[in-house]
């Protein structure tokens, strides 16, 4: 007869593991997959020759190990980050620290072209950001976009760089206007059936484009997207008009990028930016700088009154509305700061103060 009293207390090893897990874990949309909050953004992982704010391999691997040790088990990257070096370093981090593959959720993306080192040896090359030109090149045709040929080629290349058999969540980086939705969604579905990809997601596009792709998958009984990685923070809320409503209604998990607006929501408005990326405000133009400064000042005021960093206030507002933000971290100190943000809850009055100055602006980042 079994002695069930033996199992009335959890083992010490489990308690120890929970104490070390400083991240929270949340369901990704209607899927059963749990992802960490926060998600570690991989754009900072790679080679500083691509952008000056990117960490080199040694510092990148140290950061990834620190993330794993703290329970940040979800790592987001893309094939184009540091022209593939971000993916390679993530794979090396797993091997060098003997991290079991099954204990990390790896997200990557396909759509843009990765610079071919046999064509251009400069890792800082920006081939990815000229999609119309890459379609005219003998070296890049069928190596970008979302055709069946391109999707398969890009995923196989990512698997080699990551040195893994599967990708946990594959995001399409943008919508492809040159390829029928049926071709893209069938290719993605087949990758899932082949167990090379386990879940599908999408990033930054118009809500109607995302709905078209989801409907295409649904009517054909193909794999649907479980996540949307869109641009969303206190300074850019245009996604609230359509995309966020659609995702919430249909069970798609929101994992936004740029949660701290390239650092604008993490330092006082009069503070000095420390990187080229922060100095130039990130990838997109701020159409309402006066309103953005007012919001940032209010974030700072609430942070001072609460005795916490500004990032805690910005993330407390966002975490209430999404599954998990994708955050690019440049140091272990910043990582610990972000992890400590879990404890803060804003009052309704504080949230209203943060939201009131916002002014509508043209949508950005969908192409």
From Swiss-Prot:
Region named Disordered: 346-367
SUPFAM superfamilies: NAD(P)-linked oxidoreductase (SSF51430)
Presence of the UniProt keyword rRNA-binding in the record: no
Top-level EC class: oxidoreductase
Species this chain originates from: Alternaria alternata (Alternaria rot fungus)
Positions of NADP(+) binding: 76, 203-204, 229, 258-268, 330-338
EC number: 1.1.1.-
Keyword list, A-Z: NADP, Oxidoreductase, Virulence
Inducing or repressing factors: Expression is up-regulated more than 10 fold in toxin producing cultures.
Pathways per UniProt: Mycotoxin biosynthesis
Residues annotated as the enzyme's active site: 81
Function: Aldo-keto reductase; part of the gene clusters that mediate the biosynthesis of AM-toxins, host-selective toxins (HSTs) causing Alternaria blotch on apple, a worldwide distributed disease. AM-toxins are cyclic depsipeptides containing the 3 residues 2-hydroxy-isovaleric acid (2-HIV), dehydroalanine, L-alanine which are common for all 3 AM-toxins I to III. The fourth precursor is L-alpha-amino-methoxyphenyl-valeric acid (L-Amv) for AM-toxin I, L-alpha-amino-phenyl-valeric acid (L-Apv) for AM-toxin II, and L-alpha-amino-hydroxyphenyl-valeric acid (L-Ahv) for AM-toxin III.
Other observations noted: Gene clusters encoding host-selective toxins (HSTs) are localized on conditionally dispensable chromosomes (CDCs), also called supernumerary chromosomes, where they are present in multiple copies. The CDCs are not essential for saprophytic growth but controls host-selective pathogenicity.
Keyword Aminoacyl-tRNA synthetase: no
Residues at which substrate binds: 173
The protein's name in its UniProt record: Aldo-keto reductase AMT2
Taxonomy, superkingdom: Eukaryota
PANTHER family to which the protein is assigned, alphabetical: NADH-SPECIFIC METHYLGLYOXAL REDUCTASE-RELATED, OXIDOREDUCTASE
Gene: AMT2
Family: Belongs to the aldo/keto reductase family.
GO terms of molecular function: oxidoreductase activity
């Amino acid at each position: 007869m079994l002695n069930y009293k033996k199992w009335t207390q959890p083992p010490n090893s489990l308690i120890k593991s929970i104490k070390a897990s400083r991240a929270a874990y949340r369901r990704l949309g209607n899927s059963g997959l749990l992802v960490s909050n926060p998600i570690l953004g991989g754009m900072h992982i790679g080679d500083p020759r691509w952008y000056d704010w990117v960490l080199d391999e040694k510092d990148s691997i140290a950061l990834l190990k620190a993330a794993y040790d703290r329970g940040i088990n979800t790592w987001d990257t893309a094939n184009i980050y540091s022209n593939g070096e971000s993916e390679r370093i993530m794979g090396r981090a797993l091997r060098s620290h003997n991290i079991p593959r099954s204990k990390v959720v790896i997200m990557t993306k396909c759509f843009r072209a990765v610079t071919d080192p046999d064509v251009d040896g400069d890792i800082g090359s920006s081939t990815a950001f000229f999609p119309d030109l890459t379609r005219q090149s003998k070296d890049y045709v069928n190596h970008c976009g979302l055709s069946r040929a391109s999707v398969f080629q890009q995923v196989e290349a990512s698997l080699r760089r990551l040195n893994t058999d599967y990708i946990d969540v594959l995001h399409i980086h943008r919508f492809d206007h040159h390829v029928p939705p049926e071709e893209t969604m069938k290719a993605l579905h087949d990758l899932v059936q082949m167990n090379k990809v386990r879940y599908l997601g999408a990033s930054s596009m118009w809500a109607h484009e995302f709905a078209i792709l989801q409907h295409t998958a649904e009517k054909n009984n193909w794999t649907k997207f479980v996540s949307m990685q869109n641009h969303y923070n206190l300074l850019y809320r245009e996604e609230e008009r359509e995309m966020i409503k659609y995702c919430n209604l249909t069970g798609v998990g929101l994992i936004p990028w740029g949660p701290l607006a390239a650092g604008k929501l993490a330092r006082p408005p009069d503070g000095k930016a420390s990187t080229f990326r922060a100095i130039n405000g990130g990838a997109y133009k701020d159409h309402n700088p006066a309103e953005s400064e007012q919001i940032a000042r209010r974030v700072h005021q609430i942070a001072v009154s609460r005795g916490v960093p500004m990032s805690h206030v910005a993330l407390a507002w966002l975490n209430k509305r999404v599954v998990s933000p994708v955050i690019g971290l440049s140091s272990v100190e910043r990582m610990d700061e972000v992890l400590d943000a879990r404890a803060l809850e804003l009052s309704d009055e504080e949230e209203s103060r943060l939201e009131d100055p916002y002014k509508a602006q043209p949508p950005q980042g969908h192409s």
